[in-house]
Amino acid sequence: ENIKACVFDAYGTLFDVNSAASKCKEKLGSKWEGFANAWRTTQLEYTWLRSLMKKHKNFWEITEDSLDHTMETFKIKKEMRNELLDLYKKLSPYPEVKKCLEGLKAKKIKIAILSNGTPELLKMLVESNNIQNYFDDIFSIESVGIYKPDSRVYEMPIKKYDCKPENICFMSSNT
């Protein structure tokens, strides 16, 4: 009753960050899962380090940098880079996502994404999965220039929906 909006993180919450590597299982071989996990871990570490150093780089550049590092660590052929990056732009949603969004829409609750991703990347993700019509807003950290968990990031939906933090249900797979 007090919830005005449900705000989802995108990567790892709505979209399976391992799905790009999963689609390349045959080429990556048995190390695909370790590779996928290392890529994501490196990506998150790079965002935290950049925030601490106050040297912002957009999420796509960090995704590329973390992929390059992980490919080198796992000795993956350079030819796979573009394929993995193209697949990352179209990550698969988790199976329960559409049903969850439909349920929230039926309750007339505002639905939004709050993500480290760039506006362009997030738009591509929701459109490639045909779920763009479920979202009232997509908030990107690019408008504040610092990564989560900085409090300024979470103020965006609070200001937009003119409410208190306790009126927003924020859902994320990252803690």
Where are the regions that the model predicts?
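Acidic di-acidic motifs
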Residues: 172-173
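Substrate-recognition "cap/lid" segment bordering the active-site pocket of phosphatases
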Residues: 118-169
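Short helix-capping segments at alpha-helix termini
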Residues: 28-32, 73-79, 106, 130-134, ...
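Glycine-rich phosphate-binding loop signature in dinucleotide/nucleotide-binding domains
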Residues: 1, 106-109, 161-167
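Substrate-recognition element of Asp-dependent hydrolases with the DxDx(T/V) motif
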Residues: 78-92, 97-127, 137-141
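Active-site neighborhood of HAD-like aspartate-dependent phosphohydrolases
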Residues: 1-44, 73
